[in-house]
C-alpha cells in the first residue's frame, strides 16, 4: 500500500478515492436505510427488499472493515485484535470461526483477508444488490455518476495518511477503529462480556431491523401516523450517535495507564443509553404534535 501511495503515478489519488469511497458507501447505506425506515417504504410489499437491504448493510461494513485492516497500521492492528477476541468469545464454534476468518499466521491472515475483501464479500454484495435494486442499477446512472464524481473530487482535495505502521516490538499508540465500528468499540470498553457487548447487542439490533416490516401494523406510511416505529428509529439514531462519539473518546489524563484511559464507566454509559429511550419517545411525541398542529393551521 505504501508503494502504491508513494511510487505509483497518481497512486495516492487512487488510494484516497478507495478510502473515501468506502466511507461514503457505509454512510450512504445507513442514510438510505433510515430514509426507507421513516418513509415506510418497506410496507409496500417490500419485505424481501428491506431484509436484503439490512443484510447488505452489514456486509458493506464487513467489506470496509476487511479493507482497512490489510494496511497493517496501528489502527488496523487494533481492529484485527477486536475481531479475534470477538470471534473467540462465541460459544463452542468461536475458535473455529476465528481460525477460518483470520488464519493461523501472518501470511495466512493476509491471504484470507485479501480473499474476503476482493472476492468473497464482493460476490455476496453483488448477489444481494441484484435482488435489492436491479432496476436502479440501470435507471440511476446519473446519480451513480454524481456520487462517483464527488468521490473523485474528495479524493483529490482530502488526502488520507497511511497512519503509523504496526510494529510488534513497539507499544501501540492511542488509536480507535474507523467511525463505523466505534459504537461497538464503546460497548466493549465497558469491560462487560465481549460476546454480549460486541456481538449480542449488535445482533439483536440487526434482528429488530429485519423484523420491522412484520411488526409494523400501522396502516399509513407517514412517520406522523406511526408513532411507535418513529420513536424506535429516533431512539436508535440517538444511541448510534452517542456510542459512536463515546468510541472516539479517550481520557485526556496521560498520568494514568492507557488501559485505564480506555475504560468507559458502565453505569454512566448504560444509564445514558437507557435515558435516551424516554427522551427519544418524548421527542417523537413533540414532533408529531407540532406537525399535526402545523397541518391543522394550514387548513
List PLM regions with ranges.
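Membrane-embedded and interfacial regions of multi-pass energy-transducing membrane proteins
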Residues: 1-19, 24, 29-299
Amino acid at each position: 500500500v505504501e508503494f502504491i501511495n508513494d511510487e505509483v503515478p497518481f497512486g495516492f489519488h487512487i488510494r484516497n478515492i478507495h478510502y473515501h469511497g468506502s466511507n461514503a458507501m457505509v454512510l450512504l447505506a445507513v442514510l438510505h436505510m433510515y430514509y426507507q425506515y421513516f418513509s415506510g417504504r418497506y410496507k409496500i410489499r417490500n419485505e424481501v427488499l428491506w431484509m436484503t437491504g439490512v443484510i447488505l448493510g452489514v456486509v458493506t461494513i464487513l467489506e470496509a472493515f476487511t479493507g482497512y485492516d490489510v494496511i497493517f497500521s496501528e489502527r488496523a492492528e487494533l481492529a484485527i485484535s477486536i475481531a479475534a477476541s470477538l470471534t473467540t468469545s462465541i460459544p463452542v464454534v468461536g475458535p473455529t470461526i476465528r481460525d477460518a476468518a483470520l488464519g493461523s499466521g501472518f501470511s495466512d491472515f493476509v491471504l484470507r483477508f485479501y480473499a474476503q475483501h476482493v472476492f468473497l464479500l464482493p460476490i455476496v454484495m453483488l448477489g444481494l444488490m441484484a435482488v435489492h435494486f436491479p432496476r436502479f442499477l440501470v435507471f440511476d446512472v446519473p446519480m451513480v455518476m454524481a456520487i462517483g464524481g464527488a468521490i473523485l473530487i474528495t479524493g483529490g482535495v482530502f488526502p488520507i495518511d497511511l497512519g503509523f505502521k504496526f510494529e510488534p516490538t513497539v507499544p501501540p499508540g492511542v488509536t480507535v477503529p474507523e467511525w463505523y465500528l466505534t459504537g461497538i468499540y464503546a460497548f466493549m470498553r465497558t469491560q462487560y462480556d465481549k460476546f454480549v457487548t460486541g456481538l449480542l447487542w449488535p445482533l439483536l439490533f440487526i434482528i429488530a431491523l429485519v423484523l420491522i416490516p412484520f411488526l409494523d401494523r400501522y396502516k399509513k406510511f407517514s412517520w406522523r401516523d406511526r408513532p411507535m416505529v418513529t420513536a424506535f428509529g429516533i431512539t436508535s439514531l440517538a444511541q448510534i450517535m452517542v456510542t459512536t462519539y463515546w468510541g472516539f473518546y479517550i481520557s485526556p489524563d496521560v498520568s494514568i495507564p492507557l488501559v485505564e484511559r480506555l475504560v468507559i464507566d458502565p453505569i454512566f454509559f448504560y444509564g445514558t443509553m437507557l435515558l435516551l429511550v424516554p427522551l427519544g419517545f418524548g421527542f417523537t411525541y413533540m414532533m408529531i404534535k407540532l406537525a399535526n398542529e402545523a397541518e391543522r393551521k394550514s387548513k
